[in-house]
Amino acid sequence: MRHGKSGRKLNRTTSHRKAMFANMAASLIEHEQIVTTLPKAKEIRPIVEKLVTLGKRGDLHARRQAIAAIRDTEKVAKLFSALAPRYESRHGGYLRIMKAGFRTGDNAPMAVVEFVDRDVNAKGATDHERKVAKVTEKEDS
């Protein structure tokens, strides 16, 4: 019987699932918006919302718990310095999940996960810089 069992397995082992959620949380904190499948989006929401709550707490123990969860000190620094002050007056509900149609190929339901009051410049800025650097590198060769 599955009484009291919560969460989806997503056809992955426990360690793979934990690593995937850590990577997704880090990407969401960095870019403030990600596109993923709807079941993954529904699973990542409570994880990231708890991380933002840790950021709002702001003490050393909360910082260490956040580092243990996502394993990226740069993202944790952004969480505590940029995201936590932004959501200081908001009690939960930091993320928005919007359905984004179906993926070509396997028809999987897709979703956009984003922070409610996100910085629109956070998404794509580093990606654009990386792309420009790659293009100039190809032209130089």
Swiss-Prot record:
Ribosomal protein as UniProt keyword: yes
SUPFAM superfamilies: Prokaryotic ribosomal protein L17
A GO MF term: structural constituent of ribosome
Family (UniProt): Belongs to the bacterial ribosomal protein bL17 family.
One of the GO BP terms on file: translation
Matching HAMAP family: Ribosomal_bL17
Keyword Ribonucleoprotein applies: yes
Protein name in the entry: Large ribosomal subunit protein bL17
Subunit structure and binding partners: Part of the 50S ribosomal subunit. Contacts protein L32.
Alphabetized UniProt keyword annotations: Ribonucleoprotein, Ribosomal protein
PROSITE patterns: RIBOSOMAL_L17 (PS01167)
Cited Pfam families: Ribosomal_L17 (PF01196)
PANTHER family linked to this entry: LARGE RIBOSOMAL SUBUNIT PROTEIN BL17M (PTHR14413:SF16), RIBOSOMAL PROTEIN L17 (PTHR14413)
Taxonomic classification: Bacteria, Pseudomonadati, Pseudomonadota, Alphaproteobacteria, Hyphomicrobiales
InterPro entries found in the cross-reference section: Ribosomal_bL17, Ribosomal_bL17_CS, Ribosomal_bL17_sf
